[in-house]
């Protein structure tokens, strides 16, 4: 009897696990695969762009389709799904998480560590270059279906694109949790539809299946040489969004993403690209828009609507990714503090960063108006994607050798293959710098300069503060030996270093000559892991006389919460805290550029400007503004 019950329980648990896995896989399809899933809208069309000079013969069509097929198999199916996704930082993926993981076994003062950090930051910056192009090219290419369905409405493509994008960014502040539940099912329908369209045309021209043979890809490269290499820059468009598989791993887990990729996404993409190839063999004039011309005439308008919805979902995933990446960068100290709002009480990862939102919209609208069509924008797209792919491969190599201790020869062989592919794609896209590739490169370079300036500037400020600082615990012992006047209430001193006396305390003692009965020195520390367990978050030292030194540790995917820290500290010390009865003392630092060693004076001025415009601690830590006492201090750098 017991064996029967245990078997039933085990079967129920297995069934529940399978159901949960399927639910996560469907949710992942709605978030992770939007970008790569909408690539069929423009990838093959761009590969046969008239500028490339590739004739629309059967052999060249087979060659390009073969290149697309093997790019998906090697880069998505093998590199990302099998290798890169193994390199998780406590379950979290993405270029910054991978960078933090690769730096863990290294001495941070070495040149290698510095180079890897710079690589990781540059990869993050290139993501923003991608984030401004994805919504523009995706939505525009979907709306351009109107030119095929109803040619007399072609003049409305640009205005409709602009309205959709403004609406998309406008709703961000309200959160997308409600409509987000529909993303997965809608994208499942999208992948089934594009697969069905592909199968219909493959059945009419079954010879297209021969493109599975890599001989056709190699033959195409050999026959067309430089032209074929230029085409590689368009082939990479089938891989846009591949990095999202890794970056969103923390939200869904590796298994559901692999299940969705191998079970639905990759087969659907391959079938659709082969279907487009079959259509072109049958009717070369269909190169005008091979994706939409897959559909029968009666299905054109519904396909335009479905495509537009799918591209909005793809854009939403990129926008959410930009918020998450910004939040990570703030916690890791690469970006100034910004106001981060949580839009869902249930989903901790759903955040909204107003500054990022409106900057993205402004740049995207400028791009749409400036480039005017998805064809013009396609040249700008690949370079950000391929640069991030190269950086991910290099960082993954370090993790394989230094963290996993894999055999160096084995790692060398694996990485040589992946780097050859990545660098081939990156080199092909460098040829398109003048046609639009300058855009993501320029955005990435500007952001890289700003992030490195901020990181270096904060490092200099910490050095100056530490050089002039007073050790905290000996100071407190001396203070208690000759105490100033004690006043009732609680004072919280927020400080960046739990070993040094906060400047705000020195100013308070100097000007007000009082010390609160209960005084807490609170320091927030960001670890190189995404999340910190609640039972290990807080550490505290009782300095006596009602003085406490508290350190709160957070992961780079978490937002520091002063209220939660005080509640947890209160529970462990049998105290109660009321935010409205607590005074928070902060040092308001004014950075003064000087000719002291550190950075060039103009970079110091840029840093000072960034420092001045960073979000106030009251906004960032959600502290009631009327409970804060800010005491000014100047720091020369």
Curated annotation (Swiss-Prot):
A GO CC term assigned to this protein in UniProt: plasma membrane
HAMAP family cross-referenced by the UniProt entry: Kup (MF_01522)
Record family assignment: Belongs to the HAK/KUP transporter (TC 2.A.72) family.
Main location: membrane
Organism ancestry: Bacteria, Pseudomonadati, Pseudomonadota, Betaproteobacteria, Burkholderiales
Keyword Cell wall biogenesis/degradation attributed: no
Recorded topology in the membrane: Multi-pass membrane protein
Membrane-crossing residue ranges in chain numbering: 24-44, 64-84, 113-133, 151-171, 182-202, 225-245, 261-281, 290-310, 351-371, 381-401, 409-429, 433-453
Gene expressing this chain: kup
Keyword line: Cell inner membrane, Cell membrane, Ion transport, Membrane, Potassium, Potassium transport, Symport, Transmembrane, Transmembrane helix, Transport
Record organism: Burkholderia ambifaria (strain ATCC BAA-244 / DSM 16087 / CCUG 44356 / LMG 19182 / AMMD)
Function per UniProt: Transport of potassium into the cell. Likely operates as a K(+):H(+) symporter.
Protein name from the UniProt record: Probable potassium transport system protein Kup
UniProt subcellular location: Cell inner membrane
């Amino acid at each position: 009897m017991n064996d029967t019950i245990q078997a039933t329980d085990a079967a129920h648990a297995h069934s529940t696990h399978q159901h949960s896995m399927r639910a996560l896989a469907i949710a992942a399809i709605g978030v992770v695969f939007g970008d790569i899933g909408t690539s069929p809208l423009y990838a093959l069309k761009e590969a046969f762009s008239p500028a490339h000079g590739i004739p629309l013969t059967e052999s060249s069509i087979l060659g390009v389709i073969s290149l697309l097929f093997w790019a998906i198999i090697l880069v998505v199916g093998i590199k990302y799904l099998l290798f890169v996704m193994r390199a998780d930082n406590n379950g979290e993926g993405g270029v910054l998480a991978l960078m933090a993981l690769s730096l863990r076994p290294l001495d941070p003062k070495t040149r290698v560590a510095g180079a890897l950090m710079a690589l990781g930051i540059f990869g993050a910056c290139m993501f923003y270059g991608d984030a401004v192009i994805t919504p523009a090219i995706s939505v525009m290419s979907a709306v351009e279906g109107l030119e095929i369905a109803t040619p007399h409405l072609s003049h409305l493509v640009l205005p409709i694109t602009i309205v959709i994008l403004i609406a998309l960014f406008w709703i961000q502040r309200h959160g997308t949790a409600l409509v987000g539940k529909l993303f997965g099912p809608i994208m499942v329908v999208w992948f089934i539809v594009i697969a069905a369209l592909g199968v219909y045309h493959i059945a009419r021209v079954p010879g297209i299946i021969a493109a599975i043979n890599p001989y056709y890809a190699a033959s195409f490269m050999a026959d067309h040489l430089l032209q074929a290499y230029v085409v590689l820059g368009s082939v990479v468009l089938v891989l846009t969004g591949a990095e999202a598989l890794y970056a969103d791993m923390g939200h869904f887990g590796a298994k559901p993403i692999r299940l969705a990729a191998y079970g639905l996404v990759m087969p659907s993409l391959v079938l659709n690209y082969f279907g487009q190839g079959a259509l072109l063999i049958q009717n070369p004039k269909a190169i005008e828009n091979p994706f939409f011309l897959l559909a029968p005439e009666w299905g054109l308008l519904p396909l335009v609507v479905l495509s537009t919805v799918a591209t909005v979902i793809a854009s939403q995933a990129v926008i959410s990714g930009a918020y998450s990446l910004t939040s990570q960068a703030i916690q890791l100290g690469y970006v100034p503090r910004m106001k981060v709002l949580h839009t869902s009480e249930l989903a901790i990862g759903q955040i909204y960063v107003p500054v990022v939102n409106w900057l993205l919209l402004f740049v995207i609208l400028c791009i749409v108006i400036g480039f005017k069509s998805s064809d013009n924008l396609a040249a700008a797209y690949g370079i950000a994607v391929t640069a991030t792919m190269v950086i991910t491969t290099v960082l993954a190599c370090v993790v394989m050798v230094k963290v996993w201790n894999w055999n160096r020869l084995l790692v060398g062989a694996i990485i040589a293959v992946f780097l050859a592919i990545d660098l081939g794609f990156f080199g092909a896209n460098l040829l398109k710098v003048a046609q639009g590739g300058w855009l993501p490169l320029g955005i990435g370079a500007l952001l890289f300069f700003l992030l490195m300036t901020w990181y270096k500037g904060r490092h200099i400020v910490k050095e100056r503060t530490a050089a002039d600082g007073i050790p905290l615990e000996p100071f407190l012992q001396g203070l208690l030996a000759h105490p100033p006047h004690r006043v009732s209430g609680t004072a919280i001193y927020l400080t960046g270093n739990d070993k040094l006396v906060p400047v705000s305390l020195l100013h308070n003692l100097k000007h007000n000559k009082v010390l609160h009965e209960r005084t807490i020195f609170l320091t927030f520390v960001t670890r190189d892991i995404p999340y910190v367990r609640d039972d290990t978050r807080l550490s505290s030292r009782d300095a006596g006389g009602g003085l406490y030194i508290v350190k709160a540790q957070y992961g780079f995917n978490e937002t520091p919460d002063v209220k939660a820290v005080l509640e947890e500290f209160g529970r462990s010390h049998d105290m109660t805290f009321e935010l409205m009865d607590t005074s928070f003392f902060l040092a308001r630092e004014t950075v003064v550029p000087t000719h002291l060693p550190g950075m060039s004076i103009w970079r110091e001025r840029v840093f000072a400007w960034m420092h001045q415009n960073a979000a106030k601690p009251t906004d960032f830590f959600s502290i009631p503004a009327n409970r804060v006492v800010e005491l000014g201090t100047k720091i020369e750098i």
